[in-house]
From Swiss-Prot:
Subcellular location: Membrane
Name of the protein: Taste receptor type 2 member 9
Protein family per UniProt: Belongs to the G-protein coupled receptor T2R family.
Chief localisation class: membrane
Extra remark beyond the main annotation: Several bitter taste receptors are expressed in a single taste receptor cell.
Glycosylation sites: 164
Keywords annotated in UniProt: G-protein coupled receptor, Glycoprotein, Membrane, Receptor, Sensory transduction, Taste, Transducer, Transmembrane, Transmembrane helix
Organism: Homo sapiens
One GO cellular component term noted in the UniProt record for this chain: membrane
Stored Pfam families: TAS2R
Tissues with expression: Expressed in subsets of taste receptor cells of the tongue and palate epithelium and exclusively in gustducin-positive cells.
Length: 312
């Protein structure tokens, strides 16, 4: 019988999981239906589909990890199961963040106006460049998540005297924990790429605004609006990642922290917010997805009105 804290955890994580999978599944479904209708798919749709699928995987593995830890602690201790969860978690986490950085780079290349030959060449070859970056992101995430030989990590943290049983358990967790922490430091690279994209977009906006004022053609033109939307999208991602990443690192090292189970439960709840909430931000920021979402809401509203029981 789960305790009150565990019951609250199950309710919250189940709610977040439902919202997150629904939101990301909606992105995949709408873009795939549009792809089948038009027999063609745009670059932004490929990026959004890749990002949504990776986040569905991430949400599922985070939730399964929490449920196994809570409901089947004996099974959770199985080294094979833990290894599988770690591999899938590392791959889904890294691919999600790398694909988000791809989205930031796409905004930069599509919207920004920077007078540099290399940047101009990237804009001309945007489809090939972005597909190459997407493929590279997938391969990097796959390579990082491949299980490695743990001998090196165990030699780094070898302890000769382990008299206390609790400490012995914690020491046995150090190599795997340190390995996971080291591997997850790789997500700083997509974060830095998003940061660079943000500053370049900001630079392009400032430069564009000066040109508009110089020629006195108005301020709120389509290019300025596009800059503002892209900057807002990147800022929201950066803010969510600033919250997500430290919590994720704490979760990874939960075996070394007192009350590690409670830390892991709180961490699960916080980390699931990132892939769940960001999906709806992407929906509202994309005209096609936003239109489909509003149509669906109108349909649900009409359906509920028809199902409303008649009261004489």
């Amino acid at each position: 019988m789960p305790s009150a804290i565990e019951a609250i955890y199950i309710i919250l994580i189940a709610g977040e999981l439902t919202i997150g999978i629904w939101g990301n599944g909606f992105i995949v479904l709408v873009n795939c239906i549009d792809w089948l209708k038009r027999r063609d798919i745009s670059l932004i749709d490929i990026i959004l589909i890749s990002l949504a699928i990776s986040r569905i995987c991430l949400l599922c593995v985070i939730s399964l990890d929490g449920f196994f830890m809570l409901l089947f602690p004996g099974t959770y201790g199985n080294s094979v199961l833990v290894s599988i969860v770690n591999v899938v978690w590392t791959f889904a986490n890294n691919s999600s963040l790398w694909f988000t950085s791809c989205l930031s780079i796409f905004y930069l290349l599509k919207i920004a106006n920077i007078s540099h030959p290399f940047f101009f060449w990237l804009k001309l070859k945007i489809n090939k460049v972005m597909l190459a970056i997407l493929l590279g992101s997938f391969l990097i995430s796959l390579i990082i998540s491949v299980p490695k030989n743990d001998d090196m990590w165990y030699h780094l943290f070898k302890v000769s005297h382990e008299e206390n049983i609790t400490w012995k358990f914690k020491v046995s967790k150090i190599p795997g924990t340190f390995k996971q922490l080291t591997l997850n430091l790789g997500v700083m690279v997509p974060f830095i790429l998003c940061l660079i994209s943000f500053f370049l977009l900001l630079f392009s906006l400032v430069r564009h605004t000066k040109q508009i004022r110089l020629h006195a053609t108005g301020f709120r033109d389509p290019s300025t609006e596009a800059h503002m939307r892209a900057i807002k999208a990147v800022i929201i991602f950066l803010l969510l990642l600033i919250v997500y990443y430290p919590v994720f690192l704490v979760m990874t090292s939960s075996a070394l922290i007192p009350q590690g189970k409670l830390v892991l439960m709180i961490g699960d709840i916080v980390t699931v917010i990132f892939p769940s909430s960001h999906s709806f931000i992407l929906i509202m920021g994309n005209s096609k997805l936003r239109e489909a979402f509003l149509k669906m809401l109108r349909f649900v509203k009409c359906f509920l009105r028809r199902r409303k029981p008649f009261v004489p």
